[in-house]
Amino acid sequence: MSQFFEAATPVAIPTNNTNGGSSDAGSAATGGAPVVGTTAQPTINHRLLLSLKEAAKIIGTKGSTISRIRAANSVKIGISEKVPGCSDRILSCAGNVINVANAIGDIVDVLNKRNPENEDAAEGEAEEHYYFHFLNHILPAPSKDEIRDLQQLEDIGYVRLIVANSHISSIIGKAGATIKSLINKHGVKIVASKDFLPASDERIIEIQGFPGSITNVLIEISEIILSDVDVRFSTERSYFPHLKKSSGEPTSPSTSSNTRIELKIPELYVGAIIGRGMNRIKNLKTFTKTNIVVERKDDDDKDENFRKFIITSKFPKNVKLAESMLLKNLNTEIEKRENYKRKLEAAEVDATVVTERSDSASFLEEKEEPQKNHDNKEEQS
């Protein structure tokens, strides 16, 4: 039986649009309305691999398209700078889980749209073969046998989601159970690349389907990543577009850096600084364009109360910015815990005062009772 692509059905989340979701992503042709959450949602930062043409299309004329997506979904979106000689760029999208998923659904919708004035060029772009093989589709193009409404065939799009290798197994699940469930539930196709992106510990998860369906499956993938208990405070390297060395070995941000700073962060605050699913530290790395490595804690480590953070970049000002932001986050966390501690102490003092007053009142009542009895006896006599 053929796999049918399915239009998205809204997930069990309130759909009154308080964040101004894009109307384009909610059309029937693109697979259903995007979901919008009204309650506080956990935050995530997703990264997509783009070709130069795709990046230009998402940016739009004078940045109009990316600005619209950013404003409509209340997210932070940025695209890495062009690296001479490289055919790829990275899009980062950060915000709460649902808004990020909606924004990426809008991105798929933008990439699906073709220029009616130049259909031949659009066809040529779709069939282009890239030297950087990660840009080539892993999944075959959708066929007429896989869709019930042939008019919607061209509305099927795809994303190349960059995911740390430590999360891939959780997304796939035991014997592929999780990824099969996502495919069947949302009417999409999903596949993980076998190869790692150059000089990194990340792989590509390619998702193919209607924009609305991709939105919904991204929400579940985000939840899997955020709840992944096997998160390692590791030396996992993030991928950045770069050229290879003449020897054939890729140049990674960590090996090409000429500026390096090491910070020791108290172990008590490491979890808060890194954030859930390493989300906070990833956002910091993306914003400052640096590579930040959190060293693993060894059993024989002499500084057992501290963890080493290593910041590297070929731009000294970026390293300094990352250092100042990291220390600011640390000071904020320390101050937050101190304030909480003071509030607890104040509450304990208030409770003690109330108890003392209650004891005093009880003592006075006990003292007044015999006096009343004595007065009553005198009146009777």
Swiss-Prot record:
PTM (free text): Phosphorylated by the plasma membrane-Anchored casein kinase YCK1. Phosphorylation at its C-terminus reduces its RNA-binding capacity.
PROSITE patterns, alphabetized: KH_TYPE_1
Entry GO terms, CC: chromosome, telomeric region; nucleus; P-body
Keywords recorded for this protein, A-Z: Chromatin regulator, Chromosome, Cytoplasm, mRNA transport, Nucleus, Phosphoprotein, Repeat, RNA-binding, Telomere, Translation regulation, Transport
InterPro entries referenced in this protein's UniProt entry, alphabetically: KH_dom, KH_dom_type_1, KH_dom_type_1_sf
Domain KH intervals: 43-107, 156-221, 258-326
Region (Disordered): 1-34, 357-381
Residue ranges of coiled coil: none
Domain of life: Eukaryota
Modified residues annotated as Phosphoserine in this record: 358, 360, 362
Compositional bias per record (Low complexity), positions renumbered to this chain: 15-33
GO biological process, alphabetically ordered: chromatin organization; mRNA transport; regulation of translation
Record localization: Cytoplasm; Cytoplasm, P-body; Nucleus; Chromosome, Telomere
The UniProt record lists the keyword Cytoplasm: yes
Gene Ontology molecular functions: RNA binding
UniProt-listed Pfam families: KH_1
Bias-annotated ranges (Basic and acidic residues): 369-381
Family: Belongs to the HEK2 family.
Assembly information from the UniProt record: Binds RNA.
Function (record text): RNA-binding protein involved in the correct localization of transcripts in the cell. RNA localization is a widespread mechanism for achieving localized protein synthesis. Required for the asymmetric localization to the daughter cell nucleus of the ASH1 transcript, coding for a specific repressor of transcription. Overexpression inhibits translation of the ASH1 transcript. Involved in the stability of transcripts, like the MTL1 mRNA. Involved in structural and functional organization of telomeric chromatin and regulates silencing at the HMR locus.
UniProt name for this protein: Heterogeneous nuclear rnp K-like protein 2
Organism: Saccharomyces cerevisiae (strain RM11-1a)
